[in-house]
Amino acid sequence: MTDNQIRELFDTVPFFVDNPIEVLRSSRFIRSMSHCDSASVNTGLIYGTANPVYQGMTWREFLSHGKKMKKNLDRFTVNPEYYLSHERSGTPPFFCFQDGKGYVAEDGNHRACIAKFFLYAQPSPLLHGVHLVEVQTDARMENLFSRLKRLLPP
């Protein structure tokens, strides 16, 4: 999708458009975990996904080639208010925020991508009514564990 096409849809071309979609990595050492069935997430803090199909694509590539993107973009052009509303119909997007970085954990990759672009130019970057799991990991323990594994024979 060209800059002009993105600008036509969202009024601006966000800085992250050519950033790669990151991988949600599991951690062996979790300090805390919380869950909320109806949360609001800052779409500016969404960096990636658990879905291997989209990992490594840029946000621009995903906007252009996502499996259900055309259908979701058509819905967006008819009803952009969906992305501003506190109400959700159907299955809400499911996010995991791990150590402050957001990832689409299950459902909602296409909607999250559109929300990330659309809400970038809005007064509030918050997407409401989503499922959310927040995880804080112990990076120090993860590092120690990795170092210890390297010391052990194969």
Q: Language-model features: where?
A:
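Primarily interfacial, aromatic-capped hydrophobic alpha-helices that serve as membrane anchors
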Residues: 147-154
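Short alpha-helix boundary/capping and kink motifs at helix termini
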Residues: 2, 7-8, 13-23, 28-104
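A short, basic-hydrophobic beta/loop patch
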Residues: 87-147
